[in-house]
Structure formats: C-alpha cells, structure tokens
C-alpha cells in the first residue's frame, strides 16, 4: 500500500512540476519516408493559401494535375536526401535542445503537410493540461502562404478540441531582430572560413512566390527586401564588405509570373565571381536548401566554371538559434 501511495505521490509531483506553457514550432513539414511524398504534395496543393483557387473542386483538380506531374521527380529528390526530408529530424533535435535549455516550458513542433500535424500535437498538450500556448512560426518573414496557413491550421485544430481552451500567443515574424541577424552573419562568416568576403558575391536566396499573391497584398517580398537591407546595415557596422549583396527567389513552379530575379539567373549573371548563398527564408534545412541550393545549383556552378560556390547551412538546431527562440518567447508581450 505504501508503494502505491509513493507512486501516486510521484505522479502528482511530476504533474505539478511539468511546464504549464508549451511552445509549438510551426513549419511546413516534409516527407518522413518516400511513401509520404504523395501525402506531402496532396496536402500542400490542397491548401487554399498555396493554391489560391477559390473553387474547391477546381483547386483539387489543378492540385491533382500538379501532383501527378511532380511526384516521381520529388521521390527522386528525396531518394538523394536519404529517403526523407531532413526538416523533421532537425526540428526534433532543436526541440530537444530547447527543452534542455529552458525546462520552464515544453517545446514541441507541428507540421502543416506531414505528421505530426497540429491536431495531433494539441491533443497531446491537452492531456498534459497545458494552460498557455505560444505558436512560433519558423518562417522569419510573414507570408499568407506559410505563416498564415500554419496559424490558420493550428487555430482550427485548437477550436475542434472543445474542452481545451489555453491562453494563446503568437510569434509571426522575427526577421528584424538584430540578434537573429548577428547569428546569420556569423553563419556566413563561418561558411567563408577565413576567405575574404570582398572576393564573394553574397546571394540571399528565398522561396519564390507567384507575383499575383504579392499583388493581392502579401507582404513577403517587402519583408524579404527589408531583411536584406537590415543585414547590409549590420555588415557595414561590422566592416564586412562583399563584392555585391543580392536577393533572389528560388523554387519557381508552373508557367505563371513569379517574383524575380531567380537564384539561377543571378548565379548565371555572376558566373565570373565567387558566390556564397544564404537561405534567408528558411530556418531549418530542407529539400530546397540541401538539394536545390547545395546539389542542383552546385552542379550548375561547376558547369559555369565558377571558382568557388558556397552554401550556408540554415540555423537548424544550433545552440545560438535555440537561445534566440527562448529569448523571443520570454520577451513576448501578454
């Protein structure tokens, strides 16, 4: 009987000690296996924030056509990445580090297009009797296609849990934070590895968007341009000159007009220079950074006989980024 009472007391003590606030890192996700490539594409192209066709039937039809045209190519890409996206395991490692550094909160993550979905994560947090939540967008710049889509999904999932009504706060953008930009600049310098910065063209590559989405009021392009200007100011303050500092857009899909210039276009244009690329719109490495920037465009750079072509890693699960997230959460206003 004493043993049973002791175990019950331990459970009560653990419950009392367990954090009452949870931070959910929100990202797009990526296939956790080759089987999930189809799931990933289906969920992405059924998202009205991605494929902005108001008629549900038409959106599903167009989405199915895109999926059928891309699924085999996408599987080959993920085969080259070891059969899955690196995004989920890196995000898991980041939350492990966050929980070690800040045991006063519980850090977890939810993905938009692949498990773990927001609905699954929120059900778990309801069982943990969490009292407050922070939805932390992992996209530095705001866009309806990423940030708003993730928040909409998370809030809808929360509404479906009728008995779980925690207090919710959000972090929807953080690109203007000087501490973040110092980490980015240090990552660039680390990748240069004592090479002279003035010998390189620095390209900040971000995920592209159809121009029609920006024309409809999305602030993404404006925020990306502002982010680059802030980084240029910081480089000037720290006396770190580059041959040129440019912004480009990658991952164009389909025949419609997208934001320009493209990353490919700038690599071609500066073929006589050394090039270093930083993936400015991504915080966690994924197929667009590892395959597109570091494999596909590296082959292009070799064909163009570019002497040095460097690609910076994302912030990933670095201790600097983890500390930045913790500080942003601590400083979040009520």
Curated annotation (Swiss-Prot):
One Pfam family hit: Ferrochelatase
GO biological process: heme biosynthetic process
Its EC number(s): 4.98.1.1
Residues holding Fe cation: 207, 288
Gene Ontology molecular function: any one: metal ion binding
Catalysed transformations (reactions): heme b + 2 H(+) = protoporphyrin IX + Fe(2+)
Enzyme class per UniProt: lyase
Protein name: Ferrochelatase
Encoding gene per record: hemH
């Amino acid at each position: 009987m004493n043993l049973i009472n002791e175990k019950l007391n331990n459970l009560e003590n653990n419950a009392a000690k367990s954090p009452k606030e949870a931070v959910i890192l929100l990202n797009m996700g990526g296939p956790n296996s080759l089987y999930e490539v189809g799931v990933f594409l289906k969920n992405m192209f059924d998202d009205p924030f991605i494929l902005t066709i108001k008629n549900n039937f038409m959106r599903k039809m167009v989405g199915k056509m895109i999926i059928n045209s891309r699924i085999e190519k996408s599987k080959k890409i993920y085969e080259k990445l070891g059969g899955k996206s690196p995004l989920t395991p890196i995000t898991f490692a980041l939350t492990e580090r966050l929980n070690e550094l800040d045991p006063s909160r519980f850090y977890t993550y939810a993905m938009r297009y692949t498990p773990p979905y927001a609905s699954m994560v929120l059900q778990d947090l309801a069982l943990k009797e969490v009292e407050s939540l922070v939805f932390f967008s992992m996209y530095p710049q705001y866009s309806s296609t990423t940030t708003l889509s993730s928040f909409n999904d998370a809030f809808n999932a929360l509404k479906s849990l009728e008995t779980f009504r925690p207090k919710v706060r959000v972090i929807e953008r953080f690109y203007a934070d000087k501490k973040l930009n110092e980490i980015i600049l240090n990552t660039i310098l680390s990748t240069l590895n004592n090479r002279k910065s003035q010998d390189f063209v620095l390209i900040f590559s971000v995920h592209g968007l159809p121009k029609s989405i920006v024309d409809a009021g999305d602030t993404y392009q404006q925020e990306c341009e502002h982010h680059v200007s802030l980084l240029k100011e910081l480089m000037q303050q720290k006396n770190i000159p580059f041959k040129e500092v440019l912004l480009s857009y990658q991952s164009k899909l389909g025949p419609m007009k997208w934001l320009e210039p493209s990353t490919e276009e700038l690599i071609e244009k500066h073929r006589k220079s050394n090039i270093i690329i930083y993936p400015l719109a991504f915080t966690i490495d994924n197929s667009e950074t590892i395959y597109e920037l570091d494999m596909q465009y590296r082959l292009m750079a070799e064909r163009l006989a570019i002497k040095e072509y460097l690609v910076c890693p994302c912030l990933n699960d670095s201790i600097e980024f983890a500390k930045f997230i913790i500080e942003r959460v601590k400083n979040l206003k009520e």
